Structure formats: structure tokens, C-alpha cells
């Protein structure tokens, strides 16, 4: 069994209600959670510490997803990235291709979906760190 306790997760979303819900779920799982509502806050957090997983919402107004992902990759290539989405995964696969999104989290979601995401992201992050 994977030890998910103390897994470092950074949440980026402009909706405080969604942010609070995700924080609560991740805390129940045992993750250490940092959350931000602004892009500059997200990058400040990323520059100041290591994270195993970044979760962000596709629907953040004005967010250039491809540019955002490119910037994250320059900071840490071994970090898993998950995007919260509302449409079927095929839409995002066609739109973003190999842009660095490792996981899609389809809304609405609950504890079990987030737990599965965190488990898979943790395993993936470990593989990336071992390979680098």
C-alpha cells in the first residue's frame, strides 16, 4: 500500500468553494495541501518548494493552459499534473495532446475519485523522480 501521508499537493483554482472541497478531501486522504487562487501565487509556491502533484481547474478565466503547463515544466519536470475538467477526456486530449497534463479529474467528483487520482499521481511522480 502506498503511503500517501505527507504527499505535497498544490491546488490552483479561482473558485473558493471548489478549493475548500478539494482541500478537505485531500486532507482526509492525508496529503499536505497548499492552495492558491491566483497564477502568480501558484508559481511563487512552486518556486519555494517541492510538490508531488499540482491540481488546477481548466475553467480559470484567462488561463492559457498550454503556457501554464510549459512554465510548470521549467520549474519541475518530475511533478504530476492533474486538471479538473467538465467535458469528456477526448476533448482535452485532442486540444492539449502531449502538453504535460498527466491526469484529468472529471467534475463532479468525490472522495473516491480524488483518492484514486492521488494514488496514481504519487506512483507516477515516484517513477519520474527515479528516472531523472
Spell out what each predicted region is.
Residues 38, 64-67:
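Acidic catalytic/metal-coordinating carboxylates
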Residues 78-90:
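A short, hydrophobic beta-strand element within the central beta-sheet of small alpha/beta folds
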Residues 67, 87-103:
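Alpha4 helix (beta4-alpha4-beta5 surface) of REC/receiver domains from two-component response regulators
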Residues 57-59:
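Active-site residues of response regulator receiver
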Residues 35-53:
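Acidic, metal-coordinating helix/loop segments flanking the phosphotransfer/catalytic sites
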Residues 109-119, 126:
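C-terminal output helix
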Residues 15-34:
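Two-component/phosphorelay signaling modules centered on CheY-like receiver
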Residues 66-78:
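Short amphipathic alpha-helix used as the core "switch/output" element in two-component signaling
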Amino acid at each position: 500500500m502506498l503511503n500517501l501521508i505527507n504527499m505535497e499537493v498544490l491546488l490552483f483554482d479561482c473558485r473558493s468553494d471548489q478549493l475548500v472541497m478539494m482541500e478537505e478531501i485531500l486532507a482526509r486522504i492525508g496529503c499536505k495541501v497548499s492552495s492558491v487562487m491566483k497564477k502568480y501565487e501558484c508559481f511563487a509556491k512552486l518556486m519555494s518548494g517541492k510538490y508531488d502533484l499540482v491540481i488546477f481547474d481548466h475553467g480559470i478565466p484567462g488561463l492559457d493552459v498550454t503556457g501554464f503547463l510549459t512554465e510548470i515544466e521549467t520549474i519541475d519536470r518530475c511533478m504530476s499534473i492533474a486538471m479538473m475538467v467538465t467535458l469528456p477526456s477526448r476533448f482535452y486530449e485532442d486540444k492539449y495532446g502531449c502538453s504535460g497534463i498527466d491526469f484529468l479529474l472529471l467534475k463532479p467528483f468525490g472522495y473516491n475519485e480524488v483518492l484514486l487520482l492521488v494514488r496514481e499521481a504519487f506512483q507516477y511522480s515516484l517513477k519520474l523522480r527515479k528516472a531523472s
